[in-house]
């Protein structure tokens, strides 16, 4: 009898708690709108994270979701001439292929339109701004994101976001921490509107050296620590070597490490070729990733796919895949299937093969 009474009391207490919770949720929804709070379950599932390809199949695989996540802040950093802007322009081109509106905030005043066009960027549809101050640049970014009509905003670069106080001051004046404070405020303002609008914001950043570091890496990025915390993905891009055709250097071997990833396991590393005037070499990746996935076989210096030999030496195999786009698409689809990614779009691939 006592057990039954205790059971009834627990039921009543649970019912009271549920009633109080329902009342609190109703009050929140009245005050802040429907959908401002919900249960993370089957009835109100959070949509899967939408991704935009980076233009590099290997990097898409390393990121775990097939590309860079929409509705998030991304940081791409590395030394000079490492391929930061090239990689970002490939992301812009891929987003435009999906019908998205892209904006490029060129704080460095260094964007080469012809190079962007070679990488597949539609210049007629690309919004570009060359702001005078860091405050102006970040205000433009905030307005574009809040509009809900822009899919991707690129800021090139954080180091060039000079605060107004520094521009108006004399050369040599010390403005301690002004850029870090500016970035910290911008991150706080941008985060909520980026999530609501599902707009991806990519910040390109440069590397600086910390003075007096005895242990650990002396490298750091500009603009303080706020961007490091707010970024969902941080990519460290480096030049790993040169690609030569006889004595002429035709491109760079590039290494990218995913140093932070909130949407998949981090610390994955990938290498791909960036060819001068062409961008990321897709056929080179197909050969390297094909060998790892067991799709392409390498015997000595010969490469083969199925029963067909596709070339002696890596450069000859790359040329064979350029000349046979159907085979390249078949290899790509098998690589994607082995990693659980969606199949590539044939039309986009033809365009890339032609560029390579």
Curated annotation (Swiss-Prot):
Lipoprotein is among the record's keywords: no
Source superkingdom: Bacteria
A Gene Ontology BP annotation from the UniProt entry: DNA repair
InterPro entries: AAA+_ATPase, DNA_recomb/repair_RecA, DNA_recomb/repair_RecA_CS, P-loop_NTPase, RecA-like_C, RecA-like_N, RecA_ATP-bd, RecA_C_sf
Keywords, in A-Z order: ATP-binding, Cytoplasm, DNA damage, DNA recombination, DNA repair, DNA-binding, Nucleotide-binding, SOS response
Subcellular location: Cytoplasm
Main location: cytoplasm
Disulfide bonds: none
GO cellular component terms given for this protein: cytosol
Residues engaged in binding ATP: 78-85
A Pfam family matched in the record: RecA_C
Keyword Signal: no
Molecular-function GO term, any one: ATP binding
Coiled-coil region: none
NCBIfam families associated with the record: tigrfam_recA (TIGR02012)
HAMAP family with a match to the protein in the record: RecA (MF_00268)
Record family assignment: Belongs to the RecA family.
Function: Can catalyze the hydrolysis of ATP in the presence of single-stranded DNA, the ATP-dependent uptake of single-stranded DNA by duplex DNA, and the ATP-dependent hybridization of homologous single-stranded DNAs. It interacts with LexA causing its activation and leading to its autocatalytic cleavage.
Name this protein carries in UniProt: Protein RecA
Originating organism: Paracoccus denitrificans
Lineage, uppermost ranks: Bacteria, Pseudomonadati, Pseudomonadota, Alphaproteobacteria, Rhodobacterales
Annotated gene: recA
